Amino acid sequence: MTPATPSGQASTVPAGRAAIRVRKLTKAFGHQAALRGVDLEVAEGEFLTLFGPNGAGKTTLIRIIASLARPSSGTVHICGQDLSKEATAVRRQIGLISHNPLLYGDLTADENLHFFARLYDLPDAAARIDAILEQVGLTSRRRDPVRTYSRGMVQRLTIARAVLHDPAIMLLDEPYTGLDLQAADMLRGVLQELAASNRTVILTTHNLEQGLEMCNRAAILNRGRIGWQGQRSEVDLDSMKEVYRDVTGRP
């Protein structure tokens, strides 16, 4: 198969309103540039996988979209809302799974989820929390402090927190990192549900096989720039490996 979009060109976003629109985004840490003029659009209901090696800027981009970091310049719009002006409203539309679990270690799973339920002013929070803890397999540990959890259990609770408020947009930053087999299988099931739903998803990873499994569009971020974008239907694993090597210089 031939990749759809040559390196450096913008891919056509499917018809429909852009759920995420990033324009000329830059981010520097001192004299070190993490993002160098990123342009990216993700349509409503689209599942985009963002590939890139370590240090490419994936986490920085996700943190900015999630309103956890500010760009040096450029703009981000979420469902038409300017992130710089309406960050609180935007956060209610986003669920985030990242390296930082955003959980309180001294609180129990119950207490963590009830805390976030209050932040989102969720109706019927108790019933919602019961159902989600059952779904992620943590009902029997719901009253134990999170600091006593294994890495896989923490990630399962992170997933529960991320989907608690039924967000329209899910951001998953290298979600498979450090997971045990049970947690990885559960996460794969969550991703399958997201792919079948009407949610907008960005998944970041450097694992080509995992990243291509459920997306309908892919992009490669390298050294702070989008080097390639294309439709999933127009690439297979072998051609994606070739494109990735051409863009990043890495296998």
What spans do the regions from the language model cover?
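Conserved ABC transporter NBD signature motif
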Residues: 74-82, 90, 228-230
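Conserved ABC ATPase "signature" region
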Residues: 114, 118-141
